[in-house]
Amino acid sequence: MAGHQKEKAIADEVHQNQILRELYLKELRTQKLYTQYHVNPLRKVHTIARKPMSWHDNLEEPADARFLNLIHHAAQGPRKKYPETQTEGQEIGWDSEPLVNPQRDDRRLNHFRVYKDITLYKAKMWSLGEDDRHK
């Protein structure tokens, strides 16, 4: 069976030309060249916003004072906008002034580092790597 292969007969030029013509016409039917573009009415259209930092787009627009005041008011902190807190979270730190005037010379509240002779001596020993805890 493997030895009984049929050899294809070479088609004549007329038949070959007819096949190529059918292929060419089929390609022309399926291929569509778009030269006119339009918006599809069934698709959702996205609005294209202008560039706010572009100087050439905004030449004709005058500055709106009311809009600028609104932006400046929104940029202020809540303490400048409102006389009292608006939420419970704002209550923390709303009054930033200390309740008691801090006195820097009061030893009960202020514990500053004090360098005396013994502390300077011990700091020097530690910087040299000596340790006398076990003596």
UniProtKB/Swiss-Prot annotation:
InterPro entries in the record: CFAP144
Originating species: Bos taurus (Bovine)
Ranges where the record places region Disordered: 75-100
The protein's name in its UniProt record: Cilia- and flagella-associated protein 144
Subunit-structure text: Microtubule inner protein component of sperm flagellar doublet microtubules.
Assigned GO CC terms: axonemal B tubule inner sheath; axonemal microtubule; ciliary base; sperm flagellum
Function as written in the Swiss-Prot or TrEMBL entry: Microtubule inner protein (MIP) part of the dynein-decorated doublet microtubules (DMTs) in cilia axoneme, which is required for motile cilia beating.
UniProt keyword Protease present: no
Keywords: Cell projection, Cilium, Cytoplasm, Cytoskeleton, Flagellum
Subcellular location: Cytoplasm, Cytoskeleton, Cilium axoneme; Cytoplasm, Cytoskeleton, Flagellum axoneme
Similarity section: Belongs to the CFAP144 family.
A GO molecular-function annotation: microtubule binding
Biological process annotations from GO: flagellated sperm motility
Pfam families: FAM183
Lineage, top ranks: Eukaryota, Metazoa, Chordata, Craniata, Vertebrata
